[in-house]
């Protein structure tokens, strides 16, 4: 049974990767997020530290590289404007609708087949596929938050309903017992809980991005003055504040992703260990 658990987990992750390529909305959203955060990271790649140690330049030329970087970031304007917000909302609404619709279909199916245990199980199968789809999406969005900021994880995306439905069906084909049915019911309930938990994590990260923009706005407003005056103390102030804010962003992003990945590991692998008990 452990081998079966490993096999199913590998199949889920494989499907997640391919689904990301096939889903234009998700692919567009991920590309937009990566592009915007990469541009924002120009501040962190500022040559400020190197220029601070450089004694060959003096006067107005010492922080030329840092000033150029800061000016480019300011020229980018609103990286997370209406277009990005629309993409985020489209992905969220699409999967929330899938979750709600599949739940409704499950309930309707059970009403029509109250005495048919096998049909009832198929209803749970469909609902579980939708739940796992939503769950994997928010795990992936959490992972992406770290990818674009620290370039780490890019392994999980949204799986399609059909393959998951087929896999769960295959699991049930060899088991008609009440014990198996109860285990599956408990499994789906826990998946439902984790799906909602991951949605809340996604909202938290969105809030984190908004906080970053609020904090960085007054810093970018001082760039014009720094470029114009080219004063050493002004450049130092702008650069140090920018780097400090980005450090906070990276730290909080890592903590969020660790929570997401913890849920992912439990949901995609350890939940299936129900079959070993």
Swiss-Prot record:
GO terms for cellular component: membrane. The chain crosses the membrane at residues 124-144, 145-165. The keyword Membrane applies. It is a multi-pass membrane protein. It is found in: Membrane. Pfam families: DUF677. It comes from the Eukaryota. Keywords: Membrane, Transmembrane, Transmembrane helix. InterPro entries: DUF677. Coiled coil: none annotated. Disulfide bonds: none annotated. Belongs to the UPF0496 family. This is UPF0496 protein At3g48650.
